[in-house]
Amino acid sequence: MKTVKSYIFGLTAAIAMSTVFAACQDDFDTPAIEVPTAVNQANTTIAELKEAFWQDASNYADSVRTKPDGSHYIIKGRVISSDEQSNVFKNISIQDETGAITFSVNSYNLYLNYRRGQEIVIDATGMYIGKYAGLQQFGTPSYYENGSTWQVGFMSPQFFRRHLELNGVPDVEKLDTITVNSFSEFDTSAEGLRKWQSQLVRINNVHFQDGGVKTFSEYHSSSNDDVNKTLIDSEGNSNVVVRTSGYATFWNKKLPEGNGDIVGILSFYQSLSGSS
């Protein structure tokens, strides 16, 4: 498993800057704010949807059909990811009270339309769900010839928009961060993977293996040796890595030294050989 850490600190700075800017607008009328209201109502939790379309294979693609009664699968959740710092790449993760799921979308700067804390309602019927390298997600079916298997890749942003509605305004205070004290809590059974994949987590009392020595990544690199940095928990477990894109705005920052807490999206990678 791996965590993707990047967006928390950038978002805080953006909020502060917006507050300062707004304070300079005293001489102007405040424009009316149009608050979006979704028409569809959720009838399925994220956990229920993930279980209904789960397959144990590392890669697969399946269409989301209607329910036995003919109704659509409709979920809702709040956005927990952000690509503002160019570390999260072409995907959006949302959570509800039961779980989290990722949408693979072929677009940059998704944070401009889907802010952290924004609730979105998704009509999942007619979409495609599956796995790419072990991570369950929504996307577009593609055939992986080397592995002789189907998987899901990036869906078009237009297709994504046709299936979603914004509901209300972003509220980061309503996001739920799950606190973890040991990597051993990350169960890799099917049930455990459905629970943990794509979740927003805080891992307490961890340190980087190369803290104070290496940087988060290397410029524009995609090599695993460059972008993956080993994290060690309080029990000495080292089966979680922090993955930082070579395009991230903080790629050249030194890994912090000493123990601390880290917040990020918990992802998962599994090769066709079964290693992870």
Kindly give the residue locations of the regions a language model identified.
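OB-fold nucleic-acid-binding modules
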Residues: Q25-F89, S93-E119, D123-S276
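Bacterial N-terminal signal peptides that target proteins for export
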Residues: M1-L11
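C-terminal motif of bacterial Sec signal peptides marking the signal peptidase cleavage site
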Residues: T19-A23
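Alpha-helical transmembrane segments
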Residues: A14-S18
